[in-house]
Amino acid sequence: MDRTTARPNRRAVLATGVGAALAATAAAAGPAHAAPGRGARVEGRLRALERTHDARLGAFAYDTGTGRTVAYRADERFPIASMFKTIAVAAVLRDLDRDGEVLARRVHYTADYVKRSGYSPVTGLPENVANGMTVAELCEATLTRSDNTAANLLLRDLGGPTAVTRFCRSVGDHVTRLDRWEPELNSAEPGRVTDTTSPRAIGRTYGRLILGDLLAAHDRERLTRWMLDNRTSDERFRKGLPADWLLADKTGGGDYGTNNDAGVAWPPGRPPVVLAVQTTRFTPDAEADNVLVAEAARLLAEAMTD
């Protein structure tokens, strides 16, 4: 990678996202695989990483410029955890909002609702419980802070968790599904099919949302801006990817050490790369392993740029 190339500019990324629409469409249709030798080497390193960290690891990466793909357990199901939140916000933007009217609507909720939803660093603030929040503010809290109450309120407006599944089916994702609310959806028992996705499925869907034409241009820009401002991945993708890559992503975590990250990254002077890493472990109280996610991201980045 050319270290002298300037870091990608946020404004340029937001303005030209649709320029990668053809690449995103190619990813959805089934991208080319990496060269056999290179792909085997990367998969071997991911397998070794999985063994070292005593976890099950799934990974998917797609270079929208070259078509190069890395896939490891990419079609196996893993708990989706909070990665559903990107799709919920996209569904609000596509299916509910009209000319900003829905985004401007103020939603009121109770302290008990916050308590039942679990992790709620924004909606749980006393001033927000007292005054409510606009739908736009709920979307922002959902994506930048992974706020559970905000996500549940969006799901309520959409008609419940299965609205995420319906959205995915409508855009050709036949794997990703959501069945329960926060925080129950994070139980992550081995073998569970409900509330799951695969690295390839979530990677493709995220890529098409951020780079393609699934959303109107102004909605795609909103979604991407919120994901660029994500504050939950400092020890995951942001730790593993080169510091000069621009990243729009969403994390997720749950029981059984479930720990995920997925999004789109812009290397300097190169087309964007779609990335997804999902991990889970073998006991209900297992610790989430941020180092595993960060190291997997590092390996994927190296594979995309070597």
From Swiss-Prot:
Predicted to be exported by the Tat system. The position of the signal peptide cleavage has not been experimentally proven. GO terms for molecular function: beta-lactamase activity. Gene3D superfamilies: DD-peptidase/beta-lactamase superfamily. Its EC number is 3.5.2.6. Substrate binds at residues 250-252. InterPro entries: Beta-lactam/transpept-like, Beta-lactam_cat, Beta-lactam_class-A, TAT_signal. The active site is at residue 82. Residues 1-34 form the signal peptide. This is Beta-lactamase. The lineage of its organism: Bacteria, Bacillati, Actinomycetota, Actinomycetes, Kitasatosporales.
